[in-house]
Amino acid sequence: MPATSAGMTIAGTMFFILAKILGFFSMPSNVLMALGLVGVALTASRFARAGRRIAGTALILLGVAGWSPFGNAIILPLEERFPAWDAARGAPAGIISLGGALDTVVSPVRGEVALNEAAERMTAIAELARRFPDARIVFSGGSGRIIFDGVSEASLAARLFASFGIAKERIALEDKSRDTDENGRFTKELVQPKMGERWLLVTSAHHMPRAVGVFRAAGFPVEAFPVDYRTRGAIDLLRPFATLGDGLRRTDTAMREWVGLLIYRMVGRTDELFPAP
């Protein structure tokens, strides 16, 4: 392997690990629980008063993040950034689906393809492949795990696409990417898009701004096809959550994406802080 390529691989791995660590601490549920535990621990020391305040504040903020509409309020701008794709534009040359919807831990153990809550990233491909029979189908996704790193998402996608009845010769699989940045760069290397070709990018609506920004930075212009909406729209700005877990999951998802946008812009992986159409 050339020295330059080796250096890029090492740098990419370091960024991947650092991003996972930052991602963990970007989630309010993790941060607030950690603060709460610190507060509880301090109550057994001479800083008991400060500990009670820290624990109490963390508990209140957990309630706000979990039960209030806060999660909807911060995910909505992400979801609304790119409008639904306009079919009047005509048939695309190809369709790209990003990983993140396939469970690489459960699937090999259970012997079937297990999907998570982002399943629309995959099911949309079945409909698009039928609607545009001449379009190439590309899936980009290796394994984004540090632990429990098993099969690649691409291998599971191949099985799922076969069950959809998509001809094997239409499909191209990118199985090395571990994050959104690598999705963009590795997919361009695989596809080698020609001038004037139009490609659809299928991913969760809240993930679309960062994904489009990465593909643009890689020199691969794409048309957004957002799926997997978590809100109904502005009406959900007033809708609280019935369970703490659901609200925290929404808040975590949105915060992880906002932090991702900021980090990607800071390190030059996108050219815009909040990419738009």
Regions found by a protein language model. Give the residues of each.
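A cross-taxon signal for low-complexity, glycine/charged-rich
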Residues: 3, 7-8
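Cytosolic-side transmembrane helix boundary signature
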Residues: 32-56
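A structural signal for short, hydrophobic/glycine-enriched beta-strand patches
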Residues: 59, 64-252
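Extracytoplasmic/luminal low-complexity segments enriched in Pro/Gly and acidic/polar residues
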Residues: 236-242, 249-277
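Membrane-embedded alpha-helical segments of integral membrane proteins
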Residues: 11-41
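Hydrophobic alpha-helical segments of integral membrane proteins
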Residues: 14-22, 70, 74-78, 255-262
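Transmembrane helix-loop junctions in multipass membrane proteins, especially transporters and channels
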Residues: 48, 77-84, 268-273
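Structural signal for membrane-spanning alpha-helices in multi-pass inner-membrane proteins
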Residues: 40-43, 62, 66, 264
